[in-house]
């Protein structure tokens, strides 16, 4: 009888902590019609010791399934030439194949941060990012900050800036649609970046959208925490809280009409914007300060 009970406990425990296979995640994304956004693998720096880093969820806005990411305290990993653990980082991300620059690309994401999401600001939290290679440097990030969802033309490649896309009051507990269009072109007279949030134009940038060394780039998304010591210092703790996000309807195409229907494309392309809400990031701000958001003209983005 005792052996039988132990066996049952083992089976239940094994099922509870079984890791989701990459093939299951890819299948769920494919069912939503991912277009050219074909995932390659789990990021190699996702911790193999993580409890439930990436899983398929029945909570969805597109189709029947979404992808759930979870990051817990201490879930970091290393490779021969780099260690997230030794560099103040934790991550759980999906990784995509390298693609060439100077190509017009349209991306769509639906993200959901729970109402009770544990913000780690002022530490950095990247939800979506593109990196160029040789050298490996960030181009663009969609981040979660004290100001909410922000668009970051990253300081690795451009003049660092944070445009507020959606405040926390509207972001948390609601699905958010992100549509991002760029051509990853390094020339200032040819490059562009546009961002629509829930169908509303938030960024319309004309200028360099890459560097001369960015011939190849790749997408990764999920939860990428960095500079965690800032959170620990500000809140006097050594433990990072659990972080959870859902992604759904992830898709990439070469034109708007392939990404979404033509009527919606016309509505998106007919919009214009004259000013942005710029977030002035403070490394050790405990909360959003009144003077941390400034309205500036759209040509202020460099």
Task: Mark where each language-model region is.
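Sec-dependent N-terminal signal peptides
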Residues: 4-12
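Low-complexity, Ser/Thr/Pro/Gly-rich disordered linker/stalk regions
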Residues: 19-177, 182-302
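Sec/Tat signal peptide C-region and signal peptidase I cleavage site
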Residues: 14-18
